[in-house]
Amino acid sequence: MDKECKDISRRSFIGRTAIGGAGLLIATDILRPELATAAPKTANSTMMGVPFEATGRVRLGIIGVGGRGSSLLQDLLAIENVEVKAICDLVPEKVARAQKAVTNAGQAEPAGFPKGEKDFENLTKLELDIVYIATPWNWHVPMAVSAMKNGKHAAVEVPACRTLQECWELVDTSEATRKHCVILENCCYGATEMMVLGMVHDGLFGEITHGEAAYLHDLRGILTSSEGEGLWRRFPHINRNGNLYPTHGLGPVAHYLDIHRGDRFDYMVSVSSAEASLSAYVKANFAEGDPKRAEKYICGDMNTSIIKTQKGRTILLQHDVVNPRPYSRLNSISGTKGAFADYPPRVFVDGPKQEDWQNIDGFRVKYEHPLWKTTGDLARKMGGHGGMDYIMNFRLMDCLKRGLVPDINVYDAAAWSAPTPLSEASVAQNGTPQKFPDFTRNQWNSSNSAGFAVQT
């Protein structure tokens, strides 16, 4: 077996064993309703509204430089006064490639940490301001906790956590260490999403009563690949039945509804369809004897959930990554004066002559977000999901450098990730409502809550 095959096999084994362990955690969570019904008491004060300490220059480490981590690295290298000081990955060649990208950008070679699955702990002990985490999901919480306990802020890819216990671990650690844990939800920074948020805050749609969010993306090829995310991302479909990836759709809609800025998620119900598409794809594309043919998937092709908020509003939340279909996050809202729907983006404003949708371009001059006005050309040039990745990274680095309150905090990270275990519990109990924990400990309506991307 050559070195690459050995490496893939080792990582595949790590992914399988990690997911197996996750099944135990998940089962434990479903049987522990106290995690959802009461906020654990703590002597630590909230991180709501707490600004970063101004750094002027950001010293940064990245854990995980595969496809996603490498893309984040390119964005960060293009931002002024950001120094990439450390790189960690299980694959030495990926560390070396990332180090070369840093030196090619004119910076000193960052320290490399390729020595096994615990080497990230050495990275988090360096003199850094923030640690980016772009790894398989089972490592998000251990790595973020290590960063915060060693005095660094954490920026973690989506979803931030897999279980309610992990959600609370992030919240508790952030509050105890006074370090932020930011979820890297790039979809909150899309040009359309930020423009619609401005329309909402301007009252264009009146009082918002309903939103729709989803992740509808045909990932069959990625899930069954023999490299990259295919080494681990398919395995939750064997062990879990619910919404495995809620944040891309939910994050922007949560901002439209001012979640943790005047409202919060109260409870949700969830049902899953039968599983059929991933099994059919594997059967059609992999020969007899391939190990994938022996896998049994339990995650329904489509998971549909309804979230009710404390103020009585509703959110439709869906997940489907295995059916052939066009990409969509739904991304829509309804209010007393109008509505917005995406894919394609369009607006409806109530009025005597209004009978059909209007193209959103007619609203761009008034509502384009200042970040997109000033940085949009560079963001689009950088690429990364139409530029939203660069805007996200630029904004986070700017908040760090200037000492602003982060747009997205640990309470958002926990609440947006919580639909995974809650949907799983609801599906397992025939759609029984599941309460959301109040991760903010009753601070969700606090005046300390900063508006999203409005500080300048």
Where on the chain are the PLM-derived regions?
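Short, small/polar residue-rich loop motifs at catalytic or cofactor-binding pockets
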Residues: 301
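C-terminal helical cap and adjacent loop that interface with cofactors, partners, or active-site loops
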Residues: 16-21, 25, 71, 323-456
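Predominantly a Rossmann-like dinucleotide-binding segment in NAD(P)-dependent oxidoreductases
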Residues: 64, 176-182, 187-297, 396, ...
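N-terminal glycine-/serine-/threonine-rich beta1-alpha1-beta2 phosphate-ribose binding loop
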Residues: 2-152, 165-180
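Non-transmembrane alpha-helical segments in soluble domains
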Residues: 14, 73, 99, 144-145, ...
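Short, acidic/turn-prone active-site loops that include or flank metal/cofactor-
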Residues: 160-162
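Active-site beta-strand termini and strand-to-loop segments that position acidic
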Residues: 305-311, 335
